[in-house]
C-alpha cells in the first residue's frame, strides 16, 4: 500500500503562486462583497488551501465610493474610534465616512472578516481599494473576479 496516496498535502509558501483579481464594487452590497473578498484573500477558493500558510491572492477593489448598503444603514451605521484620551470617542456615520474617506468602509469591513493574527495582517496587505475606476496595478494583469 502506498502510504503517500491518502495523506493530506499541506501547501508550502514557496509552492503558492498568487494571482491578481480586480473587483468592481459599483452597486454591490457591502457585506456580501466583503465576505467574498476575505474568502479570496485567505485563499479558501483554492483546492490547496492551508490554514497556517498565506495562500491567498491579491485583490484590487475599484469604485469603492459606489458601494451599496441595504436598508437605512447608510444613515444609521456608525463607525466608532477612540483617541484614548478622556472624552476622545468619535462617531461617524457610513454616509459621512463615504464622503470623507470612500475606501475606509470596504477596508474596515474586509479587515473585520480576516484573522486577527500576524497571518491576517499579511493577508490584509494584499487588498488594494480605490474610490474611482482607475488603479495602478495594470502591470500585474489582474483578471476580473466573477461572483
What are these regions (language model features)?
Residues 114-130:
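C-terminal structural segments of small proteins and small subunits
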Residues 1-107, 118, 136-147:
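Ribosome large-subunit tunnel/peptidyl-transferase-proximal elements
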Residues 129-137:
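Short, highly charged C-terminal tails/helix-capping segments
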Amino acid at each position: 500500500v502506498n502510504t503517500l496516496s491518502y495523506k493530506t498535502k499541506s501547501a508550502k509558501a514557496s509552492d503558492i503562486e498568487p494571482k491578481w483579481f480586480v473587483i468592481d464594487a459599483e452597486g454591490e452590497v457591502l457585506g456580501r462583497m466583503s465576505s467574498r473578498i476575505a474568502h479570496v484573500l485567505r485563499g479558501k477558493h483554492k483546492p490547496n488551501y492551508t490554514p497556517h500558510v498565506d495562500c491567498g491572492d491579491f485583490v484590487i477593489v475599484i469604485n469603492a465610493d459606489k458601494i451599496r448598503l441595504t436598508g437605512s444603514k447608510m444613515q444609521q451605521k456608525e463607525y466608532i474610534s477612540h483617541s484614548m484620551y478622556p472624552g476622545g470617542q468619535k462617531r461617524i456615520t457610513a454616509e459621512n465616512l463615504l464622503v470623507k474617506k470612500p475606501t475606509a468602509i470596504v477596508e474596515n469591513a474586509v479587515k473585520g472578516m480576516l484573522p486577527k493574527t500576524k497571518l491576517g495582517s499579511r493577508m490584509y496587505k494584499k487588498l488594494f481599494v480605490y474610490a474611482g475606476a482607475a488603479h495602478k496595478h495594470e502591470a500585474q494583469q489582474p483578471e476580473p473576479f466573477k461572483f
